[in-house]
Design a protein with these regions (language model features):
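Bilobed "Venus flytrap"/periplasmic-binding protein-like clamshell domains
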Residues: 55-58, 69-82, 114, 135-188, ...
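Short helix-initiation/N-cap motifs at beta->coil->alpha
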Residues: 74-75, 89-100, 181-196, 232
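C-terminal motif of bacterial Sec signal peptides marking the signal peptidase cleavage site
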Residues: 17-21
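Acidic, polar ligand-binding/catalytic clefts
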Residues: 78, 87-149
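Extended ligand-binding regions for polar small-molecule ligands
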Residues: 23-25, 74-83, 148-149, 153-154, ...
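A ligand-binding cleft/hinge motif common to bilobed small-molecule-binding domains
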Residues: 97-100, 113-122, 166-169, 195-196, ...
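Ligand-binding clefts/hinges and TM-proximal coupling segments of bilobed small-molecule sensing domains
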Residues: 24-31, 36-40, 87, 162-182, ...
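Periplasmic-binding protein-like
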Residues: 55, 131-138, 206, 214-251, ...
Length: 285
């Protein structure tokens, strides 16, 4: 009886192992059965591209009125996936956690107005595709017309953003004139603070500034100062060393630039200055 019980237990354990193995293959939820992003894109034609993005960074990635994730970068990613028979997974992330998401391979790349300048050695990069600059937005009735008007003012900036890096780096002398420089999680919050008077100015990307201002009920209530804080370029960031996936995406982007698809997609966001900011095919890294 004891031997029979042992035999039954062994048989049950073996069956459980087989079933678990089958289940993990179908669901893709088991770590042991999960291929790295680098391996899967090379080996499988019908795989997925998981794009990490900040869902409050228009016009590059954001949620529209119908609740769908849209934006210029996501449109580019969708076209890349369509041409490679991949499924696009749009994965919103906390911008502060982007490196952890990428290094753990829960996402395959960061594609969302991602500045490459100063980070060249931290990721494997695509070629740049957007020339960007950091600017300051104020209320039109604020009396602030240039950087000197920011003295003693409350300025907000997104955490871990290029504007923050500039104000803590090359433009630290400018930031020293502010009453304070407060960090917020996303720019929707910053604009609500600007509307209410909780802050006097916002330092941010020009594309996002154009979108936020033009989408307000009264866009004339805001203005963008003429002088820029800094300039930079956007590129797609992959995990360091993932050159195989980067090369495949880059090849497809180059084809899209050559046949006019990138320009066509950019025209959808003409109100936010995207066509004029394109540099893909014009610059080489």
């Amino acid at each position: 009886m004891k031997k029979r019980l042992v035999l039954l237990l062994v048989t049950a354990m073996a069956a459980t192992t087989v079933l678990a193995g089958c289940g993990s293959k179908d669901s893709g939820s088991s770590d042991s059965g999960k291929k790295s992003a680098k391996e899967s894109k090379v080996e499988n034609d019908d795989d997925t591209l998981i794009v990490g993005f900040d869902a409050s960074f228009p016009p590059y990635g954001y949620k529209d009125d119908s609740g769908e994730y849209v934006g210029f970068d996501l449109d580019l990613a969708q076209e890349v996936c369509d041409r490679n028979d991949w499924k696009l997974v749009k994965q919103p992330i906390d911008w502060d956690s982007k490196d952890g998401e990428l290094n753990s391979e829960t996402i395959d790349c960061i594609w969302n107005g991602f500045t490459m300048n100063g980070r060249e050695d931290d990721y494997t990069w695509s070629d740049p595709y957007i020339d960007n600059k950091q600017v300051v937005v104020v209320r039109s009735d604020s009396g602030i017309d240039d950087f000197s008007g920011l003295k003693g003012k409350h300025v907000e900036v997104q955490t871990d953003s290029s504007a923050l890096a500039a104000l803590e780096g090359d433009q630290k002398d400018l930031a020293a004139t502010f009453a304070d420089l407060n960090q917020v999680a996303e720019y929707n919050t910053a604009f609500m603070d600007l509307e209410s008077g909780a802050c006097d100015a916002i330092a941010m990307d020009i594309g996002v500034a154009n979108y936020q201002v033009n989408s307000r009920k009264n866009p004339d209530d805001y203005k963008i100062l003429d002088k820029e804080i800094s300039s930079e370029q956007y590129a797609v960031g992959f995990k360091k060393g993932n050159t195989e996936l980067k090369d495949k995406v880059q090849k497809t982007l180059d084809e899209m630039a050559e046949d006019g698809t990138v320009d066509k997609i950019a025209e959808k966001y003409a109100d936010y200055g995207v066509p004029g900011a394109l540099c893909i095919g014009k610059n080489s890294k």
